[in-house]
């Protein structure tokens, strides 16, 4: 960033109240409110998830940074996160509902690059509950997410199963 010293004050003011945890550094594309190709409001989902994390008062490191794309175009790079969501829709009881496909165990770390594994579809309304359950599971383990996931590589998927449609 090319920021002069005299511009620092306004920049700090504009970013006040920004990300306070690793989870709040999560990535979301611009989403369907702006993007003509977007299917889901990825920014709106991320905002709901950050509100949930703050309400639950999870310690920093309990939830990982996640990646959210509002459609298959992957502008939110959902495939590279340990948890990623790709926007879509799912018919449930003959009603088309907002949904996201869940991807897990992706990585953009140099030397460990891999695409995440798609494990299923989750209704948008269920995603905060899924991540809340994950957060409590990690918190109750007495470790942070990285340590918990290293010891429980199937942990995310086993929690997610009950939220998939």
What does each model-found stretch correspond to?
Residues 1-95:
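Small-residue-enriched alpha-helical segments and adjacent helix-cap loops
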Residues 86-143:
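Mobile "lid/hinge" segments at catalytic clefts and subdomain interfaces of large enzymes
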